[in-house]
Structures are given as structure tokens and as C-alpha cells.
Swiss-Prot record:
Coiled coil: none annotated. It comes from Saccharomyces cerevisiae (strain ATCC 204508 / S288c). It is an enzyme of class 6 (ligase). The gene is MSE1. One of its GO terms (molecular function) is tRNA binding. Catalyzes the attachment of glutamate to tRNA(Glu) in a two-step reaction: glutamate is first activated by ATP to form Glu-AMP and then transferred to the acceptor end of tRNA(Glu). L-glutamate binds at R48, F49, A50, E84, Y235, H236, L237, A238, N239, R253. CDD domains: GluRS_core. It is found in: Mitochondrion matrix. ATP binds at H58, E256, K291, L292, S293, K294, R295. This is Glutamate--tRNA ligase, mitochondrial.
Length: 536
């Protein structure tokens, strides 16, 4: 076990705990003690997801919710939801509703009625009184100006002290306190922190000992505030009280919360409560190993949803941010897992310590996989058609579109789609006549030395009989290019250009089957006319 003093004004991010060494990446972390034993619980657990509605859900928050959910489901335990909304000034309109909406959309279902911390002030007051009466907390009447001076002077010390308070108010007598209360002087409630914060065990990282840097010639104290001057609890107090009262056994949260953990454990000890097990999961980073942010790839889940990301793809994507499935299953399933499969195979022993790199190429790989599964399922295929129809109806005459046609396109050609939002861009030619204005396709079409043969080919092929099926079309096309000595590539490129006006496109047989014989013959004829005009 290694003890580190934390050289920041408040607890810094784990990646900056000491110069050149941090918790991230943790492959060779100084704070790690390899745990060989099985860390996965054998009994049912109670976990929670505790977001603050100060913004909309992002990838990091969704991963935290998912891991807590999967651990609960895997052990036949319970997964709870708590809204940490005590910081009223930072609340964002619509953020609370967004949390409910995204969890439901992702099929992350909580087991009990959600708890809102803003509705539990009386509960927190009760436990603050317990700490005050036992001398483990005290009222602080210091002004903002005095506190700012203390922080400034602490930083001027050599070495500087990251703990800044001098416990002036901890020594006030009862009469002084009563007098200040009677005068209506604003106050906070501070926790009387221990001389040293307790060492704790993180199930992923092992034993950790984090202490604030202090100057022993000018003693200051890291007495965190439990109740703000507006009488609302701080995150630290509400977090500990709620986790205890909710019976939470395991807390999975981001690595950035590691520096807060000694404070929380000290509070548990002050109340005489048992602590939950802690698991701090690695940071999400870009492919270049930069911390993910709104400017660097951490889009809200709502944005991803609008872009056409499917919930099952997003869940699969997030599950692999810091967790590895059993090797035998990963090789068989190519890392594609349904929620039901994840609930079965999720295990804390699969958690990894290194930063999790977010590569959106992987997301679209998963999205394509799950989109194909939806297309092949009659029930979800109907839902996809429902999603597509409104946009088509806003563009085209109803005579050119139908639910049956859209379903047929998806079944025959949807294998090329990575997201349903691309349906129109990929398959517009099924709903409108070719414009023959795709420069790349036109160049390829007209630059062929076989233009005379192509003209002959289109003329012959533009005579399909009604009732000809896809297999017969394939056979006729093959016969045509074999008998006339054309190359297969040139034949199909010419037909695709005439039918769709683009290159590449769907398979020829599928295009003719969807367009119908009459429309296909018409387009082949128009393609021939275009060729003849352009070659004059």
C-alpha cells in the first residue's frame, strides 16, 4: 500500500495526484495492490445510480448506471435510482425528465420509487443533529471574506497546506453559539475531520491511503462542510446518509470520485455505520487518450439517439468501457451482446483499470449489427417502417411510397445501413426517377470503351416481361454478358446507373424486384437515351 498526499486546493482529479504519477492510467498505478481473489459478490447486492439533474445524461453517466444495473441483475439484487438535486442553483430544466427518459429507452429499469434529495431535508437535519450533539460536527459562522483569507494564507505557506480552515468556530462556547444564532448570523455546519483519513479498499484498485497535504508548522484542518448556509446538505452528507438508509451494498462510480471516498468513509465511521464496497471505474478518454468532454466526443445520449443510435448498440458500446467479457464468449459473439446476455455474464472480475478509449467506429459497428437484427425481426421491422414513413411522406407523393415497399427495401438492401437515419440518402432512387447527375457515376458510365456494347445491353435488358422474378433477372443478365462477351462488372455498373443514377447501389435483382418490371424497363430505356445523348 502506498500513501500519497494530495497537492491540490481541493481534491484533484486522480490523474494529477502526484506529478508524473496518477490513478489514470492505472495499469501500473502506485495506488494499486493486485487483488487475486474473486471480487464478484456471491450474494444479492443493492446498487444505485445517483445522477445530478444539472445536465443531460452523457456516456460516462450511462456507463455508471449500466454497471450498477448489471451487477444488481447478475446477483439477483436491486438497482435503485436517486436524484442528487440539492444544488438548486445548478439544476437544468428538463434534466430530471431526461434521466427518466434515457434510462427507460435503454431498458435500465430501477426497482423502487426514485428518491429525490431535495425532498429529504428533514432526514438530513436529523443526522446533522446527531453529529453536532456528539461533537463530531460544529457550526461555522466565519464570513466568506475570512474563509477566503484563510485559503489564500494556506497556499502561501511553505509547503502550502491544502487544508485551510483553522477551526476557529469549533471552539465557540454554547453561549456564543446561541448569541450568533439569535443575531441571525449565517452559518454552515462542518464535519470535524479526523487527524488522518482512514485507509480504504477499493475492489478494483486495492488498498488506498489518500491524505491532504498539510504544513505541520501551521496546522489547518480539512473540515468539510456538511450543511450550506442555505440550510441544504452538501453532496458529501446526503450521499453517505442516503446510501446507508437505502441499504446500498456496492457503489460503482467514476474514478474522479476516488479523492472523496476517504471523507465519506470518515463520515460512515462517525455515524458508526458499515461502509458499502467501493469500485471506482476508469475515465473515458478519446482515442488520443484525452479526457472525454463535451468538446471532445462526449455527446449527450439524447444527441446520439437523434443521430440514429439504437439503445441496444449504445448499451453494448458502454458495457465495454472498462469491462471485458469472458474470452470464450467474446470470440464467439464478436463482442456483440444483448442486455439479457450482459445481465448473465457481467462480473466484477472483468473490470479493467486502464482508461477506456471511446471510438465511435465501434459504436457504428454495434449499431449496424443490431439494426440488422431489428430488420430481420417482424415486430421491430414494423417499428423501423413506422420511424421511416413520416420523413418519406414529407418529401414524396404518397403514390410512390408504401409501408410494404419500405419493408421490402430494408429486407433486401438494409444490410448496408449503419443507422436508420441514412435510409433516404441510401435508397432515395427507389422513390424518385434517376437524375443521372452523380458526377462520379456519370464519368464511369460514359468513359467505358464499351459504350456501344452498353447501349446494346441496356436495349436488350430493358425488355423484361411482367412476372419475371429476381432469380430470372439474375439468370437473364448473366446470359446476356456471357453471350455478348461483356464483363460482369461493366454489365452491373451500367444497369445500376440506368436504374438508380448512382454508383454503387443495391443489388440489381433486388432493385428490379422492388421497382417492379414496368418501372425497371422504363429506367433502363431512359438510361439508354441518356447514353446516346451524351455520346453524340
Amino acid at each position: 500500500m502506498i500513501m500519497l498526499r494530495i497537492p491540490t486546493r481541493s481534491y484533484c482529479s486522480p490523474s494529477k495526484l502526484i506529478k508524473g504519477v496518477g490513478l489514470s492510467p492505472l495499469k501500473k498505478s502506485l495506488l494499486s495492490k493486485k487483488i487475486k481473489e474473486d471480487i464478484h459478490p456471491s450474494l444479492p447486492v443493492r446498487t444505485r445510480f445517483a445522477p445530478s439533474p444539472t445536465g443531460f445524461l452523457h456516456l460516462g453517466s450511462l456507463r455508471t448506471a449500466l454497471y450498477n444495473y448489471l451487477l444488481a441483475r447478475n446477483t439477483n439484487g436491486q438497482f435503485l435510482l436517486r436524484l442528487e438535486d440539492t444544488d438548486q442553483k445548478r439544476l437544468i430544466e428538463g434534466a430530471e425528465e431526461n434521466i427518466y427518459e434515457i434510462l427507460k429507452w435503454c431498458n435500465i429499469n430501477y426497482d423502487e420509487t426514485p428518491i429525490k434529495q431535495s425532498e429529504r431535508k428533514l432526514i438530513y437535519d436529523k443526522y446533522v443533529k446527531i453529529l453536532l450533539s456528539s461533537g463530531k460536527a460544529y457550526r461555522c459562522f466565519c464570513s466568506k471574506e475570512r474563509l477566503n483569507d484563510l485559503r489564500h494564507s494556506a497556499m502561501e505557506l511553505k509547503p502550502p497546506s491544502m487544508a485551510s480552515y483553522d477551526r476557529c468556530c469549533a471552539h465557540l462556547g454554547e453561549e456564543e453559539i446561541k448569541s450568533k444564532l439569535a443575531q441571525g448570523i449565517p452559518f454552515t455546519v462542518r464535519f470535524k475531520s479526523p487527524e488522518r483519513y482512514p485507509t480504504f479498499t477499493d475492489l478494483l484498485h486495492g488498498q488506498i491511503n489518500l491524505q491532504p497535504q498539510v504544513n505541520f508548522n501551521d496546522k489547518r484542518y480539512d473540515d468539510l462542510i456538511l450543511v450550506k448556509s442555505d440550510k441544504l446538505p452538501t453532496y458529501h452528507l446526503a450521499n453517505v446518509v442516503d446510501d446507508h438508509l437505502m441499504g446500498i451494498t456496492h457503489v460503482i462510480r467514476g474514478e474522479e470520485w476516488l479523492p472523496s471516498t476517504p471523507k465519506h468513509i470518515a463520515l460512515y465511521n462517525a455515524f458508526g455505520w458499515a461502509c458499502p464496497k467501493f469500485i471506482h471505474i476508469p475515465l473515458l478518454t478519446t482515442v488520443g487518450d484525452k479526457k472525454l468532454s463535451k468538446r471532445k466526443g462526449d455527446m449527450s445520449i439524447s444527441d446520439l439517439k437523434r443521430q440514429g443510435v439504437l439503445p441496444e448498440a449504445l448499451i453494448n458500446f458502454c458495457a465495454l468501457f472498462g469491462w471485458s467479457p469472458p474470452r470464450d464468449l467474446a470470440s464467439k459473439k464478436h463482442e456483440c451482446f444483448s442486455m439479457e446476455e450482459l445481465e448473465t455474464i457481467f462480473n466484477l472480475n472483468g473490470l479493467t483499470k486502464g482508461n477506456a478509449k471511446v471510438d465511435d467506429k465501434k459504436l457504428w459497428f454495434f449499431n449496424k449489427h443490431f439494426l440488422q437484427k431489428r430488420i430481420l425481426n417482424p415486430s421491430t421491422l414494423r417499428e423501423l417502417v413506422d420511424d421511416i414513413m413520416p420523413s418519406l411522406e414529407s418529401i414524396y407523393n404518397t403514390s410512390t411510397i408504401s409501408r410494404e415497399k419500405v419493408a421490402k427495401i430494408l429486407l433486401n438492401c438494409g444490410g448496408s445501413l449503419s443507422r436508420i437515419n441514412d435510409f433516404h440518402d441510401e435508397f432515395y432512387y427507389f422513390f424518385e426517377k434517376p437524375k443521372y447527375n452523380d458526377n462520379d457515376a456519370v464519368t464511369k458510365f460514359l468513359s467505358k470503351n464499351e459504350s456501344r456494347h452498353i447501349a446494346h445491353l441496356l436495349k436488350k435488358l430493358g425488355q423484361f416481361q411482367e412476372g419475371t422474378d429476381a432469380q430470372e433477372v439474375e439468370s437473364m443478365v448473366e446470359t446476356m454478358y456471357y453471350e455478348n462477351g461483356f464483363s460482369r462488372k461493366v454489365t452491373y455498373q451500367a444497369m445500376r446507373f440506368a436504374l438508380a443514377g448512382c454508383h454503387p447501389g443495391a443489388k440489381i435483382a433486388a432493385m428490379i424486384d422492388i421497382l417492379g418490371i414496368k418501372e425497371s424497363n422504363k429506367r433502363l430505356s431512359e438510361g439508354l437515351q441518356f447514353l446516346q445523348r451524351e455520346k453524340k
